[in-house]
Amino acid sequence: MAAAAPAVDGVPGRGPPGEVIHLNVGGKRFSTSRQTLTWIPDSFFSSLLSGRISTLKDETGAIFIDRDPTVFAPILNFLRTKELDPRGVHGSSLLHEAQFYGLTPLVRRLQLLEELDRSSCGNVLFTGYLPPPVFPVKRRNRHSLVGPQQAGGRPAPVRRSNTMPPNLGNAGLLGRMLDEKSPPSPSGLPEEPGMVRLVCGHHNWIAVAYTQFLVCYRLKEASGWQLVFSSPRLDWPIERLALTARVLGGALGEHDKMVAVATGSEILLWALQPEGGGSEIGVFHLGVPVEALFFVGNQLIATSHTGRIGVWNAVTKHWQVQEVQPITSYDAAGSFLLLGCNNGSIYYVDVQKFPLRMKDNDLLVSELYRDPAEDGVTALSVYLTPKTSDSGNWIEIAYGTSSGGVRVIVQHPETVGSGPQLFQTFTVHRSPVTKIMLSEKHLISVCADSNHVRTWSVTRFRGMISTQPGSTPLASFKILALESADGHGGCSAGNDIGPYGERDDQQVFIQKVVPSASQLFVRLSSTGQRVCSVRSVDGSPTTAFTVLECEGSRRLGSRPRRYLLTGQANGSLAMWDLTTAMDGLGQAPAGGLTEEELMEQLEQCDLAPLASSRGSLPSPSPRTSLTSLHSAFSNTSLSSRRGSPSPPQAEARRRGGGSFVERCQELVRSGPEPRRPPTPAPRPSSGLGAPLVPPKTKLNETSF
């Protein structure tokens, strides 16, 4: 073997193609030839061996490269054979290393492999995309208004549109937002003005809150989702969002559909018009930071952990504030509102009735139950059984405590005077219970230990919870969801894991593992089984999500649909069909090529033209080279000989005459045409003459 060219300042000089190069990659030794490492131009290895990159050698003289040797092994195998064998290495890790080494053919092949499951049009569950709306003008009047009394009686200006707003890109929403920086949030964390902070839905309506304004969409059967309301720009970031889109009976007129937002201790309420537009109802003050904002029927409820609750009645147009014990949880069912407090008490409010005492104008708030251990009630769930008689519903309440306990209490309509009775107790959590859900078939609890979930199967008799055989343990799993420390992952209220869904149907958790993730995992709340996973179609991080139970079409045979709504960091909104995902649960996925099958197909072609380095390519297998898309000689042979009869010499060599190289040359010249039968040719002479001499055309090494 020829000696290598002398090195200059410790850098390997140019040597013969057959020179053996010793590498130390992350402590593991590899040996290969210079030709193998340098056949791709402008790569890390060609720069390294040409002296353009300084080298560091170990004690044995091998060139040291501080990279992962496990990932380097399939990369070196690709350089040797042009065939990719991942050898158990994850595709993203392999792509990252291929990009580091500058191996363009391998990078393109791996990028194509990644496109198997990625599409700008989403997958079969993707059902809609709403671009960012136009940034509204600033609200002119910021004086606090109570009830229907507005300044001058004029409603706030709103955007009226029945068509989809254009996506203006940098000239629209984001560009105008960057010109006018949004103020910092009350927590002092930086804000991303263009990202979706909160999403909520009710029936066929969606409300989307950005940093300083909100928009509402309505689903129409013929035209799809239409923008019907855009609020003025507010002074402070929106922290809470609530929407009610239908009140049974429709007796409230324009207040049948309302949307509300909270910023700090201030609450803004608008009435929505079905055909577009809206008017400001008023601005209300709770006096303390609003930590929960929701509708119970036509009543707007705002609560704070300090123990203050505010109620706005759509009929009386009255805003009332009441002090109770510090509130740690709440839930509503029908017209009942339950408040869990840190002293172990559960308070009850019937918001459907006139909620005021005539003598002192206080809310009718009464204590329903007190925890036996007086632990704080940190989670609440109310389940109303179907009416089995004229006496009313059987009320079942599950609650979690600050000590990790889970209790179920029940109250029969005939025993209202005696209060609820303790039914079951579970002590399976060692951290405070943060979420609890009692549904028709399951009891689900989540604690503060990385969202640890425990589930039980609930036995019922005639719709009522039964002790025979009683609740039985079902599953234990975790819904890991990390929160952002700098506020860039979205509003915490917009990333609630759930569970979502009706209490008489399968419910799901939505899992976003890291704050900047663009992929969400949908899992059954009862067992933790994965239903599906969705990835943002534009690659932007998901900053808010929710699940919407949408009314079915009026067409015969239609049924309600369940959608996953995802708000993105760039301001767009995507919709995913969870009904289809639930219907396909448990079915084996049927699709096209697997990753292995695709890689096998890609081995037959070059995805990157490398005409300048054809003469220095290593020798791949005959199958790979003969089907190469970039073999210039093969292409010209096909075009020049298409339709021409095969010469007798070619037929003779196909029958076994000549050397291996000669047969390969003849195959390339004739071109592979598997669909065309070979043209008959006379059998060559069987005499012992001199071997037939092939034409003078030369082939490069890739051709065989």
Swiss-Prot record:
Protein name: SH3KBP1-binding protein 1
Motif stretch (PXXXPR): 618-623, 678-683
Alphabetic keyword roster: Acetylation, Lysosome, Phosphoprotein, Repeat, WD repeat
Family: Belongs to the KCTD3 family.
Subcellular localization, as worded in the UniProt entry: Lysosome
Subunit structure, as described in the record: Monomer. Interacts with CUL3; interaction is direct and forms a 5:5 heterodecamer. Interacts (via PXXXPR motifs) with SH3KBP1 (via SH3 domains). Directly interacts with cathepsin B/CTSB.
GO CC, one annotated term: lysosome
Protein function: Inhibits CBL-SH3KBP1 complex mediated down-regulation of EGFR signaling by sequestration of SH3KBP1. Binds to SH3KBP1 and prevents its interaction with CBL and inhibits translocation of SH3KBP1 to EGFR containing vesicles upon EGF stimulation.
Domain of life according to the entry: Eukaryota
Organism: Bos taurus
GO biological process: positive regulation of epidermal growth factor receptor signaling pathway; protein homooligomerization
Family annotation (Pfam families): BTB_2
Biased composition (Low complexity): 611-644
Signal peptide: none
Residues recorded with modification Phosphothreonine: 163
Location of N-acetylalanine modifications: 2
